[in-house]
Amino acid sequence: MRPQDAPFRPHWWATGMSELGVEARPDVGTYGRYEFADLPPVPFALDGDLSWLEPLPSQEEWPITGNAATEFGALLAACGRTGTPLPAAFAKFMADEALQGKVRSSTGCFIDLDRAPVRVEGGGCFVRFLADQQGCLFWYLYVTEDGADHAVVCSPEYFDSEEHDVAGDLGEVSFSAESFEAFLCRYWLENEIWFASVGDGEMPDVGAEYLERYREPDGA
């Protein structure tokens, strides 16, 4: 889904990068809400198969592995009942704990998979899949009403299928990525850049180029 086609304003919730020379990412606390238009492109071809993720090493500390092993089956069943299609990359990732263990979070986020979609006021549905450890932010798949497209959105609001028949209060929901794979790729890369900056791991080969492009005023 393109940002201009989404019913939510585009922003990228993440940590600051001012110490790495990215003026567009001032440090404003654990998370800042940054301009989506300033983001550089992700440095891999995204074909829906997560081929860029598969060769990466597993992480012993701070992996985002959470409850997918126990909840993904229930989510699949619920989506089958409601006719809600899940993106191929999302299904592959949530079904494979080894893939989940390759992605880590500098803020302690973890997979917090809902057991069913939540209908969205105005059309479509949310599927929660990632949560900040302190409950500051939550990330959701947004699947359109006809199921033909999806995006990733982020909100400080907690939408859960056992608590909400319909997700309202959408004013704080931000469009965060054109697809689940695009979100996962950027999330992985930016967290690895952070860990490398504090001496906990090597800078990814594509990390320096990503930062250089981000430092340019137009984000190109």
Give the predicted meaning of each segment:
Residues 6, 46, 65-68, 169, ...:
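Intrinsic-disorder-associated interaction segments
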Residues 150-194:
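Compact, glycine/acidic-enriched structural inserts
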Residues 21, 80, 192, 199-201, ...:
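Short, flexible coil/linker elements and helix-boundary hinge sites characteristic
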Residues 1-148, 157-159, 217-218:
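A surface-exposed partner-binding patch
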Residues 1-8, 185-188, 194-202:
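Intrinsically disordered, low-complexity segments enriched in small residues
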Residues 138-143, 164-165, 195-196:
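A short secondary-structure junction signal
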Residues 12, 199-220:
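Charge-dense, low-complexity intrinsically disordered regions
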